[in-house]
C-alpha cells in the first residue's frame, strides 16, 4: 500500500532549520510587525494540535503602553521573588562546579529574562474559561489543556523564526496579577507573555546555554527503548553533536559569530537591568 510522500528536500530542510534555529529571544530591535504577518503567525498558532480538539488558547494583543508597563512590573516583582528563593542551597552550573545559593542568585539577576518594553508586539496567551467541559483526553490528565496551548505557542514560535522575527516566552509572573490586568473571566488562566518582533541577530545557541546556566541534555539521556532507562541502540552518530551543542551554528554564521554572539547580559551601573 503506497504511503504519503515526504515534502521535497528543500521544504523538509526548511522545517528542520526553523526548529534548529528557533531561539527564546530577549533582545529586540524595535520596529513593527506588519498586521498581515501578525495575522499569519496567529493563524499558524491556531492550527496547533489540541487534545479533543478543545482549542483552549486565547491570544490578547497588548498595544497599550501603560498596560505593557504594568505587566512588566508584574514580571519584575516575580523576578525578584524568584531570586530570593535562589538564595539558599547550591546548584550545579553547566560544565562547572556547584554554585552556592548567593552566587546562583547573582547569576540569575544578571540575566536578561524578557523584552516586554522593547519588543514590537506583546501577545498574552491564556487558557480559556469553561475548559472543564472538555473531557475528551483529559478525564485522567486534565493538564492536557496546558500541553495543547504549548503546541500552539510552538507553532507561533517556528512561524516567527521563518518570518525572521524573534520571540521570547515570559512565564515569570503571578498569574492572578496578570489575569486581573488583562480582565480574564473566572476560570481563564494566563500562561505566557510572548515578546515578538524584529531582532538584530538570533543567538547562535540558546542564551541560557551560552550563559552556562544549563545545557541541552544528550539525546541518549532522554530516549529509551522499551522501558525507562533502557538505552536505544539505534541512535545514530548525531549523539556526538548532542554532546557538543556549541559546535552547531545557524546557516551563514561564522566561527567568530559563534564565539562572540549577542551581548546577553546588560547590567545597569550598580546591578541588573530593571527589565531583567
Show which residues each predicted segment covers:
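Generic N-terminal amphipathic, Lys/Arg-enriched alpha-helix
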Residues: 14-31
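Small-aliphatic-rich amphipathic alpha-helix that forms the alpha element of a beta-alpha
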Residues: 45-46, 123, 131-181
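Glycine-rich phosphate/pyrophosphate-binding beta-alpha loops
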Residues: 47-52
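Extreme N-terminal tail/first-helix region
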Residues: 1-18, 105-109
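Glycine/small-residue-rich phosphate/adenosyl-binding loop
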Residues: 55-149
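C-terminal helix-cap and adjacent tail motif
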Residues: 2-7, 11, 193-276
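Short amphipathic alpha-helical segments
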Residues: 38-43
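A glycine-rich helix N-cap at a beta->alpha junction
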Residues: 80-91, 184-206
Amino acid at each position: 500500500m503506497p504511503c504519503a510522500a515526504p515534502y521535497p528536500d528543500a521544504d523538509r530542510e526548511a522545517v528542520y532549520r526553523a526548529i534548529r534555529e528557533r531561539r527564546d529571544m530577549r533582545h529586540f530591535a524595535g520596529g513593527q510587525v506588519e498586521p498581515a504577518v501578525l495575522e499569519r503567525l496567529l493563524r499558524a498558532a491556531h492550527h496547533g494540535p489540541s487534545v479533543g480538539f478543545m482549542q483552549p488558547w486565547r491570544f490578547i494583543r497588548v498595544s497599550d503602553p501603560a498596560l505593557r508597563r504594568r505587566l512588566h512590573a508584574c514580571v519584575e516583582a516575580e523576578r525578584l521573588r524568584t531570586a530570593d528563593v535562589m538564595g539558599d542551597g547550591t546548584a550545579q552550573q553547566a560544565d562547572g562546579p556547584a554554585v552556592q545559593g548567593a552566587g546562583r542568585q547573582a547569576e540569575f539577576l544578571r540575566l536578561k529574562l524578557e523584552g516586554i518594553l522593547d519588543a514590537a508586539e506583546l501577545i498574552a496567551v491564556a487558557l480559556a474559561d469553561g475548559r472543564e467541559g472538555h473531557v475528551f483526553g483529559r478525564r485522567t490528565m486534565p493538564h492536557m489543556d496546558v500541553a495543547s496551548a504549548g503546541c500552539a505557542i510552538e507553532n507561533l514560535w517556528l512561524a516567527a523564526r521563518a518570518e525572521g522575527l524573534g520571540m521570547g516566552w515570559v512565564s515569570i509572573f503571578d498569574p492572578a496579577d496578570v489575569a486581573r490586568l488583562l480582565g480574564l473571566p473566572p476560570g481563564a488562566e494566563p500562561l505566557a507573555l510572548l515578546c515578538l518582533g524584529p531582532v538584530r541577530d538570533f543567538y547562535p545557541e540558546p542564551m541560557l546555554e551560552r550563559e552556562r546556566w544549563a545545557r541541552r541534555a544528550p539525546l541518549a539521556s532522554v530516549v529509551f527503548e522499551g522501558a525507562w532507562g533502557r538505552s536505544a541502540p539505534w541512535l545514530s552518530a548525531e549523539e556526538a553533536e548532542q554532546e557538543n551543542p556549541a559546535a552547531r551554528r545557524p546557516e551563514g554564521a561564522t566561527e567568530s559569530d559563534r564565539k562572540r554572539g549577542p551581548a546577553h547580559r546588560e547590567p545597569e551601573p550598580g546591578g541588573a537591568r530593571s527589565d531583567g
